[in-house]
Amino acid sequence: EYGHKPILLIGGATGMIGDPSGKSKERNLLSESDISHNVEKIKNQVSKFLDFKKQKNPALILNNHDWIGKLNIIDFFRDYGKTLTVNYMMSKESVKKRISLGQSDGMSFTEFTYQLFQAYDFYHLMKNYDCKIQMGGSDQWGNITSGIELIRKKTGQKSFAITCPLITKSDGSKFGKTEDGNVWLDRNKTSPYKFYQYWLNSSDEDSESYIKIFTMADKKFIDSLILEHKSKPHERILQKFIASELTKMVHSEEDLESVIKASEIFFGKSTFSDLEEIKEDVFLDIFEDVPSVKISKNERSEEHTSELQSPV
């Protein structure tokens, strides 16, 4: 909207190596088929947030397997491996932290080379797409600045890094696809109902942070909503706004209406017609954690017949 061309880079190649940043042990390596599957899923998910089809300045989605997969290892180490020294690479926090763990839980050569491949990504994007700014989470600072250094040494040009803090909860734990208690954009992994409930059950402290990070509301509105919430926290005004906005953004208006009705059913605030209209998958989500027993249809039918035949 402001003239920049966003490029979403998917790590089809680097995903096979595993980024050591922020990890105390080596990641489990994914197979090529698993990564291809994930790439397609990610493309579908981000299409809700970035427009790849608009005529003016469309976003671009790229997979680094398209260029890294074609590299000859000897040529790569000769042309790019000589550019970054081992001293420079070992100065990165992610490397120092892993090496300090000792020999048993140290860093493999595979993981050590990760930053060189990510640096090459930045160089490739600048050379072929005039990309001069790379954005990412704060744990990617070392990898991104390695790219800046590679670009400087290979071309003499300036490039830039922008990172944002990793999102953490009030208890210090972080969001992440490999963390416990995570929430997914894919409705098959986190249903719209559970997605809505996740935000609805957020703490007051977390919600004050989430509304600033995840919604497009302006500062004046956010400040007034926080004040209103603090005056009657039992109504969970802040949580309801965040849950509604994010469910609409990630899923749809229809899904939002459905999960709100589902919540009303659970707390006995609905009509019989609401119960008839609700989708089966949403209904099952509501009562997933509610104590229940299963009765077969045949067993219930036999019981009913027995009641009819009983003498008055």
What are the language-model segments listed below?
Residues 1-138, 148, 155-160, 173:
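NTP-dependent nucleotidyl-transfer catalytic core
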Residues 37, 56-57, 139, 167, ...:
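Generic structural microfeature
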Residues 22-28, 77-79, 85-86, 140, ...:
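Generic alpha-helical propensity signal that fires on short helical segments
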Residues 142-144:
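Short glycine/serine/threonine-rich phosphate/pyrophosphate-binding segments
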Residues 154-306, 310:
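Conserved nucleotide- and phosphate/pyrophosphate-binding catalytic cores
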